[in-house]
From Swiss-Prot:
It is a peripheral membrane protein. Residues 1-112, 259-280, 756-791, 944-981 are annotated as: Disordered. Residues 74-87, 945-964 have a biased composition (Polar residues). It comes from Danio rerio. Peripheral membrane component of the cis-Golgi stack that acts as a membrane skeleton that maintains the structure of the Golgi apparatus, and as a vesicle thether that facilitates vesicle fusion to the Golgi membrane. Required for normal protein transport from the endoplasmic reticulum to the Golgi apparatus and the cell membrane. Plays a central role in mitotic Golgi disassembly. Also plays a key role in spindle pole assembly and centrosome organization. GO terms for cellular component: cis-Golgi network; endoplasmic reticulum-Golgi intermediate compartment membrane; Golgi cis cisterna; Golgi cisterna membrane; microtubule; spindle pole. This is Golgin subfamily A member 2.
Length: 1028
């Protein structure tokens, strides 16, 4: 506060100096605010300069200089400044306000006077400085009074502020002292707490150091264990990789088998479709057979009619032949007569008659030549017509076959489209069901999502639309195919109508031919035509019989196939049942494995607390290989249990060593007791030697003394080996140690019993001696004084020592027995656990061996399945090739038949021409020749076997017939028959190979040669495969 007053005063003086220098009179209103502002500014600056001693020194020196200057310049005011200086400077130097308050008991008038003197001094100093004169100028007193009043008011306000500030300063000093006291207390408490915490932290540090050492040792052990486990894990990982590769290969093989099974199922479906088509063809062939039967009946009727007509024509021919013979005879007679008439000259009338007869002969010859030409033309026309009929029949057959193939294709396409439509309908139903399920699931979400349908709904709607479009397109295709089928059926009907018309035309043509043949009554070729018609009828009958036999065989084959399929299905059902049983057995075995593993884990969880750190290190690795390493965990846990057993064995060794040490201590105590007993015995012997009256007791005592214990026990030394080669060796060592310890225990107990007995005998001797001594004391008191004192003092001490030793021995022996019993129990527990672990390892090994055996069996069956499937594929390819060969041979046989038939037709035509000039041959012989030549071309399955089995008889017949015929006959040469026999033989051989293939049963199925799969088509002709 003193600094502030001094600064205020100096600022006011400087302002006055400036005002007087400018020769202006400042207003009172402007000075007050400036002072107030300065005061405020000084108050803000005061706390910063309050505690700085350098600023105080500077201010004091400045004030002294100013005071000196004022004293020199104004001697009148020097007194006032000197009086006021001792009041202000001490406060400025010390920074205290209390001296000011104590040295200021002045009144307001004195203060005003001092202020006026100071102002006068200042004014005089300023005037001297300005004018250079020593005389002060005259000042207005009123102004000075007003100035003094203002200054007094300012001083009063400053005093008030000083008092307020001093009170605040006192309160602040008190608060600072309280805070400093609290701070010291807190420092002391903090130091105490810090020392305590430091001690605790040091203790914790030591504990942590110890735990760190333990953990480092454990870490080294765990690292070694972890290295072993990592090696085992790597081995098991390699094994797992091998197993995974094998599993992937087996999966691939299973997928391939599924593919083959699907292909087999598709092939079976195709076979079923083919069977259906064959059944349809069989029905159509039956219809054709019925039609052919009708045609054959009609042909029979026609043949009967033709035979009747032939008989009539034969009669007519015979009549004509008779007439011709008559005419020939007449001609011969006429010739004879002409010769006679030529030789004899006769009248001219006879010559004219001869000429007339010659003319008639020429006319008859011309007429015969014309008839022969017409017959030849009719035969040629007949042959052409037959060829045309055959060509037309072939063309119509080809057309009908093409139409049938088209119909089959269309029916197959219709079936496929129907199946596709059914599949699409099923898919649509499934999608509708899924859409319904999704709609039911999304109903609660619909309330929150009212803005629009979800993406899944839009996708489902799009898929439904696309499927509906596909269904519409397929329905349109189906309708178009149905229309095409209808059009094709119409075309077939039209073709059938055309065929009927052509047949009618053929019948008409045949009728025309019959009409023409009626004209040719004299022609002998009718016999050949009739025989040919008969042979054709026979061929048709043979063909019908062959067709019937073929259909019978087809039906038999179909029945055999159905029976084989049923047997295969039955065998497959049995195989599926067996596989199901095997699966159940495997499942039971897996459950047993899981149960055994769960038991192992439950047994091992009790011991897992010691391996918590190891499990933390190997937790991540075990989680990744948990599914594949159950057996690894079991083996690891077994090794851990063996390590624990070894650790327990080491602990047992330590305990055995401790027990040996204790036994040694007990032996030392026993030796001490023996020594004490010997000392007691010597003392007793001395007492007995000193006693003269009781010789008998001494002899007994000598007898008892003769039964002395050995001087010292041999220390039992048990050499514990560092390493055991096997667990059995460890067990044998522990059993031997226990037997030795038990023997030592028995020996010690025996010795203890002997000591007790000796002790009791000595006590009895001592009591007897005391009685004798007491009895002898009455007779000889003087001689036995010292001896009685000795006999009364020694037995009590000996008794107490022996009692203490016996108690100690009993306690020690009880402790040893208890420890040995505990060791025995612990060893029995360890043996029991070892036996359990060995049994569990054996069971695990058995399970592993069983699993490997089953896996090897399944692998072998899998290989055999593959071999059998490959064999079936090869058989199928061979069957295809054989069928292709059979088809080629049948086509070759048909071509050969057609060629032979055409040659036969041409030969028959040439024979008719030749037979017109040849001699008459009996019709029976000719019929025999025709039947010998005209053998059927298409053989039956059963008759062809007979033909192929007896080729020599047929060749002999052909040779005999050829020998009977003339050599110039081109038809009688059997050049075509052996070729047909060769093709028929090849066909029969192929049929035998197809019907009776080489039976190669699968080795894994036994006697039932069937595919080892179980499949069954459901309602939608879908095969559900059960892969075992």
């Amino acid at each position: 506060m003193a600094d502030q007053n001094r600064q205020i005063k100096l600022a006011a003086a400087k302002k006055k100096l400036k005002e007087f220098q400018q020769k202006t009179i400042p207003s009172t209103g402007s000075a007050g605010p400036k002072k107030k502002r300065k005061v405020k500014g000084d108050q803000t600056d005061a706390p910063a300069d309050r505690r700085s001693p350098e600023n105080e020194r500077v201010d004091v020196s400045q004030e002294l200089e100013e005071a000196g200057a004022e004293h020199v310049s104004n001697p009148a005011s020097a007194i006032n400044t000197d009086n006021s200086a001792p009041q202000n400077y001490p406060a400025d130097a010390n920074g205290d306000e209390h001296p000011l308050e104590n040295n200021r008991p002045l009144s307001s008038t004195e203060s005003l006077r001092q202020l006026s003197q100071q102002l006068n001094g200042l004014l005089s100093e300023s005037s001297t400085h300005i004018n250079g004169d020593s005389d002060p100028p005259a000042v207005n007193e009123k102004e000075l009074e007003t100035r003094n009043q203002e200054l007094s008011a300012a001083l009063d306000s400053s005093a008030l502020t000083n008092t307020q500030l001093t009170s605040k300063l006192e309160t602040l000093t008190k608060q600072s002292q309280e805070l400093s006291d609290q701070l010291q207390k807190e420092r002391k408490e903090f130091e105490q707490k810090f020392t305590k915490e430091q001690g605790a932290m040091r203790e914790q540090l030591q504990v942590h150091i110890q735990t760190i050492g333990i953990l480092v040792s454990e870490k080294s052990e765990l690292q070694t264990a972890l290295s072993y486990t990592q090696q085992a894990a790597r081995q098991k990982a390699a094994e797992a990789e091998d197993l995974s590769s094998r599993l992937q290969a087996s999966k691939q093989r299973v997928s391939e088998l599924e593919r083959t099974l699907s292909s087999v199922s598709t092939q079976q479906k195709q076979h079923e479709r083919h069977n259906k088509e064959l059944e349809k063809e069989r029905d159509s062939l039956r219809l054709e057979i019925i039609r052919f039967n009708n045609v054959s009946e009609e042909s029979r009727q026609q043949s009967s009619e033709l035979s009747e007509q032939l008989k009539l024509r034969v009669n007519e021919n015979s009549a004509l032949k008779l007439e011709l013979e008559d005419l020939r005879k007449r001609l011969e007679m006429a010739d004879v007569m002409l010769q006679q008439f030529s030789s004899q000259s006769g009248p001219p009338s006879e010559h004219q008659q001869l000429q007339l007869l010659l003319e008639e002969k020429h006319q008859l010859e011309n007429h015969a030549t014309q008839l022969m030409e017409s017959v030849a033309q009719l035969q040629a026309e007949r042959d052409q017509y037959a060829v045309q009929m055959q060509e037309d029949g072939r063309v119509w057959k080809d057309k009908t076959e093409q139409l049938l193939s088209q119909v089959r294709l269309m029916s197959e396409e219709r079936d496929s489209t129907a199946a596709q439509i059914l599949e699409l309908q099923e898919r649509i139903m499934e999608l509708e069901n899924t859409a319904a399920v999704m709609s039911t699931e999304q109903e609660p979400q619909a309330s929150s999502q009212l803005s629009g349908p979800s993406e899944t709904e839009l996708a489902l709607q799009e898929t439904l639309r696309s499927l509906q479009e596909e269904r519409d397109a397929l329905s349109l295709q189906f309708q178009a195919q149905v229309r095409d089928n209808e059009q094709l059926s119409r075309l077939v009907q039209e073709q059938e109508v055309k065929l009927q018309e052509l047949e009618r035309q053929a019948e008409r043509a045949s009728e025309d031919a019959q009409d023409r043949l009626r004209i040719l009554e004299d022609v002998q070729s009718d016999k050949a035509t009739i025989s040919r018609a008969l042979t054709q009828n026979r061929e048709l009958k043979d063909q019908l019989a062959e067709l019937q036999n073929g259909f019978v065989k087809l039906t038999n084959e179909n029945m055999e196939l159905t029976s084989a399929l049923q047997s295969e299905q039955h065998v497959k059902k049995e195989i599926a049942r067996k596989m199901g049983q095997l699966q159940e057995d495997l499942h039971n075995a897996k459950e047993q494995l899981l149960e055994s593993s769960s038991e192992l884990t439950s047994v091992q969880e009790q011991r897992d607390q010691y391996l918590a750190h190891l499990q933390q290190y190997s937790a991540g690795y075990q989680q990744l290989l948990a599914e594949r390493e159950h057996l690894q965990k079991q083996f690891l846990q077994q090794t851990q249990l063996m390590d624990r057993l070894q650790h327990d064995e080491v602990q047992g060794k330590v305990q055995l060593e401790q027990s040996h040490m204790q036994l040694q201590e007990v032996q030392e105590k026993l030796s001490r007791l023996v020594r004490d007993n010997e000392e007691l015995k010597t003392e007793v012997q001395e007492l007995l030697n000193g006693s003269i009256m009781n010789t008998s007791h001494r002899d007994e005592g000598d007898g008892l003394e003769s039964q002395t214990l050995p001087e010292s026990f041999q220390k039992s030394q048990i050499a514990i080996p560092e390493d055991f080669e096997s667990r059995e060796e460890m067990k044998e060592f522990i059993h031997s140690v226990l037997s030795r310890v038990e023997a030592e225990r028995d020996e010690m107990s025996r010795r203890l019993e002997e000591e007790r007995r000796i002790h009791q005998d000595t006590r009895q001797q001592l009591t007897a001696l005391s009685h004798d001594h007491h009895h002898h004391h009455h007779h000889e008191p003087h001689s036995t004084c010292a001896e009685t004192d000795g006999s009364e003092g020694v037995p009590v001490e000996v008794h107490e020592a022996l009692r203490v030793a016996m108690e100690k021995l009993q306690e020690r022996f009880t402790k040893l027995m208890q420890e040995k019993a505990d060791l025995k129990e612990r060893l029995e527990e360890l043996e029991h656990r070892c036996i359990q672990l060995s049994g569990e390892t054996d069971t695990i090994g058995e399970y592993i061996a069983l699993y490997q055996n089953q896996r090897a069996i399944m692998k072998q069956k899998h290989v055999e399945k593959e071999q059998y499937i490959n064999m079936l594929a090869k058989d199928k390819e061979e069957m295809k090739t054989k069928l292709a060969e059979l088809q080629d041979l049948v086509m070759r046989l048909v071509g050969e038949r057609n060629e032979w038939y055409s040659r036969y037709m041409s030969a028959v035509g040439n024979r008719d021409l030749l037979n017109s000039n040849a001699e008459q041959i009996h019709p029976a012989e000719r019929r025999m020749e025709i039947s010998g030549v005209d053998a059927p071309a298409v053989l039956d399955m059963s008759t062809a076997m007979d033909v192929s089995s007896s080729p020599q008889s047929s060749t002999a017949e052909i040779q005999s017939q050829s020998s009977e015929r003339p050599a110039a006959d081109p038809i009688s040469s059997p050049s075509l028959r052996p070729q047909e026999d060769g093709t028929a033989r090849q066909i029969m051989q192929l049929l035998q190979e197809i019907q009776n293939p080489q039976s190669r049963p699968a080795p894994f199925l036994g006697e039932n040669p069937c595919i080892p799969f179980f499949y069954r088509p459901d309602e939608h002709d879908e095969v559900k495969i059960l892969v075992v």
